[in-house]
């Protein structure tokens, strides 16, 4: 917490990686809440902090529809059999969702709002194919999240703007070559 006007420090005290698998592989039928719950339970068991003393669970997840809908962060926590007094929130910043979850957790600690926060993420591409959320509104009369918005159409038109299209538009605007991008990626890829 804040002490005499000083900002609190935030520390990552542990990290557990969710299992990864191939599309339609051995993990394809495992619910995302169980995958996330597995690591949350393991994390709590590795530390001497009662599960009801965690103040929040912040998880990143994109395409939060179907089995990943309904605040998957809290669902993972509860699926792990952990305390039902701990809230959770799910962050969708697309491919940066889990990273953003870590930032939000750190900000909560550094602001003095919380002391113990769990951050991470879960995604199951076998249960929710990439871009499925883009078209989930079609049965309700919405082609995709953008083209029904007058403001969006006025600004960008009706063309689809995916991450891939956006990357190309950014590269063109700022004259970034593929070689420059790959050199940058080699510095940040872990």
Q: What label would you give each PLM region?
A:
Residues 3-33, 42, 172:
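Condensing-enzyme catalytic core mediating Claisen C-C bond formation in acyl metabolism
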Residues 21-22, 26-27, 57-60, 86-101, ...:
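Cysteine-centered functional microenvironments
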Residues 36, 40-43, 47-49, 60, ...:
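N-terminal cofactor/phosphate-binding cores enriched in small/glycine residues
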Residues 42-53, 170-175:
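Phosphate/pyrophosphate-binding loops at sites that engage ATP/ADP/AMP, CoA/4′-phosphopantetheine
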Residues 61-115, 157-163:
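Conserved catalytic cysteine-centered active-site region
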Residues 110, 116-169, 173:
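Flexible glycine-/small-residue-enriched beta->alpha junction loops
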Residues 188-190:
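Conserved small/polar residues in nucleotide/adenosyl-binding loops
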